Structures are given as C-alpha cells and as structure tokens.
Swiss-Prot record:
Pfam families: FNIP (PF05725). Keywords: Repeat. The lineage of its organism: Eukaryota, Amoebozoa, Evosea, Eumycetozoa, Dictyostelia. It comes from Dictyostelium discoideum. This is FNIP repeat-containing protein DDB_G0274617. It comes from the Eukaryota.
Length: 525
C-alpha cells in the first residue's frame, strides 16, 4: 500500500530506508506536537504508554506490531489508521468511532463490518491479504471510496467491489479488472457500479472498454479517470466502451494519443495534464480541456459536430478559429481556472454558454456579441461578479439558469426574451418581476418568498423545489398545467390548483404524501 510521506520526520534506520519518510515513535513514547502522522512498529511502546497529543490524525501500525490495539488507548483526534503486515486479529474494540479511513496491507484475517464501522467512509486494501475482500461481510458499512493497491494479491471480483461507491481507485494490483468485475449479476437498478473509476500510475494492465458493463439507461453516467498508467490506452477502450461512461485523461499521462480515436457516439472526453498534445483526430463531440492542459488547442475540423466544449485551467486561450464552422458548438463552458478574456468573436457560432466561477477579468459586459449571434441559452454558476442586462444580447436568449451567484437577482438581470428560467440558491430583489415571456420557471432555495406580482401570467410549467416559505394559491396562476412540488413548509392542497392543471408531480423531498384524494387525478408518479 502506498503510504503517506512527510518532510518532518525521524527514521528508525533498522527498519526503514531514508526515502520512506515515516514518522516513527521511539521507545520513550514522546511525540512532538508538530507531527500529525505517526508510525508504530515492534520497537514501539504499548499504546497506553504513549503520550498522544491532540494533533495526531494518522497512525500506521507497521511490520509485526505485537501490542494490544484498543480504541480507548488511541486519541480522539485519529481519523486514519493503516495496518501494514500486522498479525493481530482486530475486533470491534480496536477501531475508534472517529476513524474515516482504514487501510489494510497484508492483513491475514477477514475484513468485516465488525472492524469497518459506520464512521469509516474510505477503505484501502493491498499486499498479500489472507482473504479477498468480500463486500457481503461489510453489509451496513458507509464506504464510499475503495482503493486496491500494494500489489493486492487476489482477483478483483464483483464480490470485492462494494455497491454504489462514489470512487473506486485501482493502483498496483496483481490481477487486472475483467469483464465480470464490475458487472451487476442481478441487473439491479439503479446500477451498483462506482460513480468514478480511477486508474492510477501504478496500474500496469491494459484498459479495454469491454470491462465496463453496458447500462440500459442513457440518463445515468459514470466517470473513468486515467492518470499516468503503465500501458497506453488504445482505440480498444473507446470502440467497446458503452456511451454511459465519460473518460478523463490527465494527471501526467505520458503516452501519445495519436493512435486512439473517439467514435461518433455521444461521449464526453476530458483532457487534462497530458505530456503530449491531443491531435484533432482524437477528439470526440463533447470535449473538456481542464486541469493544466499545457498545449495549444488546435482548431476542430470544419463541419465537425461539436456538441460541447468546456475549458478550465488551460495554458493557452481558444480563438475564433478553434470552433468548427459552420455548425459551431452546441454549448461552450468556461470553468474556474480559465484566465483569458472572452471576446465577442468567440461566440458567433455558440448556441449555449455556461460560465462557472470565473473572474471579472474573464467575463465583462463587452464579452458577448449584442447582435448577429445564435446564443439562446446562458447558465451562470457560482459567479462572484456583478452582472446586468448590459452583459447579454437581450433579444435572443430564451433559456437562463442562475445558480449560487453573488449578484442579487432583479428585473435588470433577466432578458425580456426568456421563456425558461431557473433560479437556484440566489438572493432576490424584493421588487423582482420575472419577464412575462417566461413559461417554464424553476425555483429552488431562494432567500425570500415569491409574490403574485413577481410570477409571470403566462406560466405553464412551474417547478417549486426546496421552498422555505408558505405556499398559497396566488403562486400558481391559472395558466399553469404542469407542477413539480418539492420540499415545502406546508402541503399543496386542492385550493391551490390552477384551473389549467393537467399534471402534478412530487419531488423526492416532498414530505406531505399522500396527496389529498381530490388531487390524485392530477398526480403523476
């Protein structure tokens, strides 16, 4: 198992080489306060003889540590414990409830939910384990991150991969993933596959697309993260990869990508910190350059169907020539880290724009063209800069999403041409009047109640989610025919129904189910 290194350490030379950089407790059991990570071996004293300070967060039990391990002997500050080739049999009395990460390398006994308690959210296994990891012995656990490392000695099977993980990390293993490792044998829905599957630099096997199971739903997606792995990826990954998987390549990936091609399927490809530039033939139809891409982004071929282009922390700006002609790009996303000024010529063929946590020097009132463009949709996410109508072409934008911005949203922030508006986690001007043209309105976690005057008279679809104020009939004009109701402080009743209502849908957090009987004829599950 890969162990954490630290510059501030002192080394037991009989056990470790100088490069190991472990923090080791000597026989006197004294820990200087600057150390948060400590290591215990057969030379170390018993736990109850060590004077732990409150800054100790990580403990390594190393190489034949023989003393008793009891949770009451450990400080309450501990959040991570790694067991490295210990012979002790651990029990429910061994692990404190404060521990979030447990690592086992060369552990010869079964790992069960008796040891891995509910507080543990991350688990690492590696080395010559006595038994393969068995998820059935971990029922009821809260594991969201699982790592295989340290030349893990068993085949990684479906029984080894805990269901519904957020992250599966594959490092140094004795055997590769195969077509049965991730496959859900019972076809359970939603699928039990990890949301993120990461292959790290010590992973030494090819990564074919066939090891990733096909999912019938096209709504659910998963991420494959590829770092500087030993073997280059090939076209075999993409040719056989189901469309549900997004692929991110970066983190120092050193192999050339020339021989790899993306097929025409609807696939998202992320390109980050790679050693070699990406050729045009490698790019798909949904591409993101992120996390230190240090090469010039080459122009996409003309007539290319580019549905989405996202830019993050890249070294060079895009230009007008980057975007293919004549079809342009479906959505251009400018993410946090992009540090170049946006100019109107970039947006001549951009149909949707998403801005995420960018600087005021990047996006100004002069960035977007005010006419002669096709920009119909704008999403503003986590912006900490002021904006108003002068920033946008006000006669063509029909869809706008505003999420978690610092700007107070009033009438002067909303184009009159809008037909669809989403306001999520925003502050509203008390005098806000939503444009009359809006027919689809989504509201979630706003800071003040809506009024009858603020709601457009032609509203047809109304999503009212996580609304912290009383709801009443005046919120639902008689033009509304579709309502989605989420968390509210009082129930939606028959008195609130607009005369035009056809469908009533409850979000997952609506707590006043079942609806009253008169409402059931509208209820759509």
């Amino acid at each position: 198992m890969s162990l954490i290194k630290n510059k501030n350490c002192f080394i037991p030379k009989k056990i470790f080489s100088e490069k190991d950089d472990f923090i080791f407790i000597p026989c006197d059991g004294v820990i200087q306060e600057k150390f948060e990570k400590i290591a215990l071996s057969f030379e170390s004293p018993k736990l109850n003889e060590i004077n732990f300070h409150k800054k100790v967060k990580i403990i390594y039990f190393l190489d034949d540590y023989q003393h008793e391990i009891k949770k009451e002997m450990l400080p309450s500050s501990i959040i991570s414990i790694i067991f490295y080739n210990i012979k002790n049999i651990l029990s429910s009395d061994s692990i404190p409830d404060t521990v979030k990460f447990l690592g086992f390398n060369g552990y010869k006994h079964q790992i069960t939910n008796e040891i891995v308690k509910g507080s543990v959210t991350s688990l690492g296994v590696g080395g010559d384990m006595g038994y393969p990891l068995d998820k059935h012995l971990l029922n009821g656990s809260s594991i969201k991150t699982l790592c295989f490392d340290g030349n893990y000695s068993h085949q990684i099977t479906n029984d080894s991969i805990i269901d519904h993980l957020d992250y599966l990390c594959l490092m140094k293993t004795k055997f590769p993933l195969n077509e049965k490792s991730l496959k859900n044998p019972l076809n359970i829905y939603p699928p039990t596959i990890p949301k993120n599957i990461s292959f790290y630099e010590t992973y030494k096997f090819p990564i074919p697309g066939t090891i990733f199971p096909k999912i019938e739903s096209t709504i659910i997606t998963f991420n494959i993260n590829i770092t500087d792995i030993r073997q280059p990826i090939t076209s075999k990954l993409f040719q056989d990869l189901p469309i549900n998987y997004n692929v991110y390549i970066g983190w120092g990936y050193r192999h050339k990508l020339d021989e790899c091609t993306i097929d025409s399927k609807i696939r998202f490809l992320g390109i980050g910190d790679v050693v070699h530039p990406v050729p045009e033939t490698f790019l798909g139809i949904r591409v993101k350059f992120y996390s230190g891409y240090s090469h010039q982004i080459k122009p996409f071929p003309n007539n290319a169907s580019l549905r989405e282009l996202a830019l993050g922390n890249v070294k060079y700006p895009i230009t007008k020539d980057t975007i293919p002609s004549p079809w342009g790009v479906g959505e251009l996303s400018i993410d946090k880290g992009y540090d170049f000024k946006l100019t109107p010529d970039l947006f001549e063929n951009v149909r949707a724009l998403k801005l995420i946590d960018i600087k005021s020097t990047v996006f100004t009132k002069h960035s977007l063209p005010k006419s002669n463009c096709v920009l119909a949709k704008v999403s503003l996410i986590s912006l900490q800069i002021p904006f108003d109508l002068s920033f946008f072409p006000t006669d063509i934008i029909n869809t706008m999403l505003i999420h978690n911005v610092s700007q107070v949203i009033g009438t002067n922030q909303l184009p009159k041409s809008l037909t669809s508006l989403s306001l999520i986690k925003v502050k509203l001007d008390p005098k806000l009047t939503i444009p009359k043209s809006v027919s689809h309105l989504k509201i979630e976690e706003i800071d003040r109640p809506l009024t009858k005057e603020s709601i457009p008279n032609n509203l047809e679809v109304f999503e009212l989610l996580n609304y912290k104020f009383p709801i009443s009939k005046e919120l639902f004009p008689d033009t509304v025919h579709y309502i989605v109701i989420g968390e509210t402080i009082n129930p939606f009743t028959i008195e609130m129904i607009p005369t035009s209502l056809k469908h009533l849908v409850s979000a997952h957090d609506y707590k006043f189910l079942p609806f009253d009987k008169p409402l059931l004829k509208y209820y759509y599950q």
